[in-house]
A protein has these predicted regions:
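Oxyanion-binding/catalytic loops of NTP- or PPi-dependent enzymes
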Residues: 2-108, 116-123, 127-128, 135-242
Length: 242
């Protein structure tokens, strides 16, 4: 979600925020006078690691603090939970989907993370990340954010999109729309202002995947014509290979 890096307080129209809920890092932004502004936290950081630590007592810890705790507490520090959104246990590949934290992956029930005697759904853990992003937005906006547009990979199926929407609702947000990441990228770079019918190629090298999408712009409306990629060629996979 490119754009100017926002600091200070802004009055966002309609109290709607845009969220890039990523596999490894996430961002929150608003639109000010037609320009996307990525909001920073109190320490000036625009990226929020998509990491949640669930201690045995107390509330979950999200972001940089959770990431720092990963080395000492890998079994209770949840990373790359986006990979499990909307997936059933029988869809999990034990060879490639083997995190350090314990997951329940038996049968055809939804994937869950087992910690401290309870099971956490991917939606619940993603909601913790979204709550942290909402808090960052609340610090930078005059009006409390109540609604959000959340991006998802173009290849996400209905179950994965519904899981993302549910995570937003668990975070206390009204999810106005789920949009494809390539479309969000094209909008952020102002390609919707092009006057002529245009086809655009968008490459997305993220923490979980490497994708190529072909978009067609016609009168300000984007349509995803085709998308192709490798769901096991993201930054996580490169790190694991190294």
């Amino acid at each position: 979600m490119p754009g100017r890096w926002g600091r200070g307080r802004f009055r966002a129209v309609g109290k709607i925020i845009g969220i890039d809920l990523g596999t490894t890092n996430s961002l929150v932004a608003i639109v000010e006078s037609g320009i996307p502004l990525v909001l920073a936290d109190g320490q000036g950081r625009r990226l929020t690691p998509s990491v949640v630590r669930v201690p045995s007592a107390g509330e979950p810890v999200v972001g940089w603090e959770a990431k720092r705790a990963r080395a000492a507490h890998p079994e209770t520090t949840i990373t790359s939970i986006k990979r499990f959104m909307g997936r059933r246990c029988d869809e999990v590949d034990s060879a490639t989907d083997s995190p350090a934290y314990p997951i329940r992956a038996n049968g055809s029930t939804p994937v869950a993370v087992s910690l401290h005697g309870r099971e956490w759904s991917p939606e619940e853990l993603s909601a913790e990340i979204l709550k942290a992003l909402r808090a960052i937005a609340a610090e930078g906006m005059i009006d409390r954010p109540e609604a959000a547009v959340i991006t998802v990979p173009a290849y996400f199926n209905d179950a994965q999109r519904n899981s993302t929407r549910k995570a937003g609702e668990l975070a206390g947000l009204r999810v106005e729309r789920i949009i494809n990441e390539p479309t969000a990228a094209a909008l952020a770079y102002g390609l919707n202002s092009l006057k002529e019918k245009t086809k655009v190629a968008v490459y997305d090298l993220g923490g979980g995947t490497f994708d190529l999408s072909i978009l067609e712009l016609n009168k300000g409306v984007f349509q995803v014509l085709a998308t192709c990629g490798n769901t096991r060629l993201g930054g996580d996979d490169i790190d694991r290979a190294l």
